[in-house]
A protein has these predicted regions:
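Hydrophobic beta-strand scaffold residues
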Residues: 55, 81, 165-167, 197
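Alpha-helix C-terminal capping segments
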Residues: 43-54, 99
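Short pre-catalytic strand/loop immediately N-terminal to key active-site residues, enriched for Gly-Thr
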Residues: 28-38, 234
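N-terminal glycine-rich anion-binding loops that anchor highly charged ligand groups
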Residues: 16-20, 39-46
């Protein structure tokens, strides 16, 4: 029986998301943006709190006003931010999004020197993962060090302490030096995961064999077109 004190801790991306105010306008003609928060681990933590769960976020922000914006939002939503440290010398990440219905949603990531990519093994230890029932990990958090090792370490700690591990595939094509590296990394951790969550494209991305399988139109980084057989991809992973 799991006697852990808290419901869920989510680990990974956190950002300010700036959405176009001008629905239908080409990106270069946008006149203004509305500020929201983003990063699927952050959003999932917020959603869990709104459903009445006890949720924490394991991420990081920079020593900047954007980080203050995120912490304030999360605190107001009831998310435990004890494990969202400020990483000096880094920047809280940002995303800018256009909205051109029905099928054009360009997206630009600003993640150079991103704070949440600097979460390390020491941060994981301080998060006391054995105190939770569920750990949610994130694909993008495994694209570079030190968060890659921190994610694998967090997963090991969770499994040793009867904490269920959920993987949000979260394939963001331009965050990987090689599209195939996403699949190699995800497949390495999948055997330790209780539940994996992803779109059809993300499942296909996990089994990419050739970079030519991926096509990105109109800078839609969150919605690439990926060639492949979805049923075969599911069997492979």
């Amino acid at each position: 029986m799991n006697t852990n004190k808290h419901d869920i801790i989510t680990f990974g991306r956190s950002s300010i998301d700036l959405y176009s105010q001008n629905i239908g306008a080409p990106f270069n003609l946008i006149k203004g943006f509305d500020a929201f928060v983003g990063g699927s681990p952050l959003n999932i933590a917020v959603g869990c709190c709104r459903l009445g769960l006890d949720a924490s976020l394991l991420s990081a922000v920079g020593e900047d006003k954007v980080g203050e914006f995120l912490i304030n939002f999360l605190t107001e939503e009831g998310v435990n931010v004890t494990n969202v440290p400020t990483k000096k010398g880094t920047r809280t990440s940002a995303v800018i999004l256009g909205i051109e219905p029905p099928d054009k949603f360009p997206l630009v990531f600003y993640r150079d020197n991103a704070s949440d990519s600097q979460v390390d093994i020491d941060d994981v230890d301080r998060a006391n993962i054995p105190d939770y029932k569920v750990l949610l990990i994130n694909g993008t958090a495994m694209n570079i060090e030190p968060t890659r090792s921190a994610t694998f370490y967090a997963t090991e700690v969770a499994l040793k302490n009867n904490v269920k591990v959920v993987l949000d595939l979260d394939f963001r094509a331009d965050q990987w030096h090689d599209y195939r590296a996403f699949g190699v990394t995800v497949r390495a951790i999948l055997p330790q995961v209780k539940i994996a969550i992803g779109t059809e494209e993300e499942i296909l991305a996990a089994t990419i064999e050739n970079v030519s399988q991926v096509e990105i139109k109109d800078q839609q980084m969150s919605a690439p077109e990926i060639k492949g057989d979805i049923d075969l991809a599911i069997k492979k992973i």
